[in-house]
């Protein structure tokens, strides 16, 4: 019975893989906040820096994205964080390890449409005591992209749950993002993102901005530059447009190598 099940799975998966290999790839630009629906094999380094009323924070990350099959991708990301609060000593060290599984749900080459879904798991490799992490969280998501005339449109929605007893500011959080890019040439694409964050549950200090039950709204203008074939540099600045905000600004930058 075991061998029969394995044979049946192979017969089902092989045609799917062959069809996916025969179809041309659908490429989209690289936002800095919104998740992409593309199944890809890449190395990426990224940097974030934000300023808020509590202080400043920076993060440098390295990530590997690897397709197990043409419709299943695994990503591993390891961040290194630096925190500089206004009322405490600065701290630095590794943050929470992030593991992501992404599955291609629908692909239409004719209509230039991709839809993917999956989940991200955050593991407590960061220090809770030093404010660098410590939470275990899971975040299911759905993301899709479509080519509309000269524009690429990408949308994503995700919900994060905290799974352990380390209570942080993001115990439950809903995010929804929309990104529009305009490829002006093969090497340059400007884009604009609309990013929303709704904190459903989470700790809030007495002097902190009250964000629970509120929807934060951010606009993120940015651009992609392809300095070399297979390499893309992306950069954007996330700016709040709502009264309730987690930060005053956040700078995103990253370099992606396709291989």
Locate predicted features.
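Cleavable N-terminal export/targeting peptides
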Residues: 1-25
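Transmembrane beta-barrel domains of Gram-negative outer membranes and organellar outer membranes
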Residues: 20-259
């Amino acid at each position: 019975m075991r061998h029969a099940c394995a044979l049946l799975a192979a017969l089902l998966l092989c045609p799917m893989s062959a069809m996916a290999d025969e179809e041309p790839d659908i490429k989209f630009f690289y936002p800095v906040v919104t998740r992409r629906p593309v199944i890809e094999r890449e190395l990426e380094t990224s940097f974030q820096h934000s300023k808020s009323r509590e202080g400043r924070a920076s993060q440098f990350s390295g990530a590997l994205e690897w397709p197990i099959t043409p419709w299943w991708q695994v990503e591993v990301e390891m961040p290194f964080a630096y925190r500089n609060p206004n009322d405490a000593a600065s701290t630095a060290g590794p943050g929470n390890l992030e593991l992501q599984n992404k599955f291609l749900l629908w692909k239409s080459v004719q209509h230039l449409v991709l839809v993917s879904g999956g989940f991200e798991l955050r593991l407590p490799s960061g220090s809770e005591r030093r404010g660098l992490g410590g939470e275990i969280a899971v975040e299911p998501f759905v993301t899709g992209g479509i080519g509309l005339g000269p524009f690429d449109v990408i949308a994503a929605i995700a919900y994060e749950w905290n799974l352990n007893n380390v209570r942080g500011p993001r115990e439950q959080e809903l995010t929804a993002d929309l990104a529009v890019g305009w490829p002006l040439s093969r090497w340059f694409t400007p884009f604009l993102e609309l990013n929303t964050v709704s904190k459903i549950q989470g700790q809030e200090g007495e002097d902190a901005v009250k964000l629970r039950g509120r929807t934060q709204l951010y606009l993120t203008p940015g651009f992609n530059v392809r300095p070399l074939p297979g390499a893309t540099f992306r950069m954007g600045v996330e700016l709040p447009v709502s009264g309730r905000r987690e930060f005053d600004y956040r700078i995103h930058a990253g370099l992606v190598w396709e291989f």
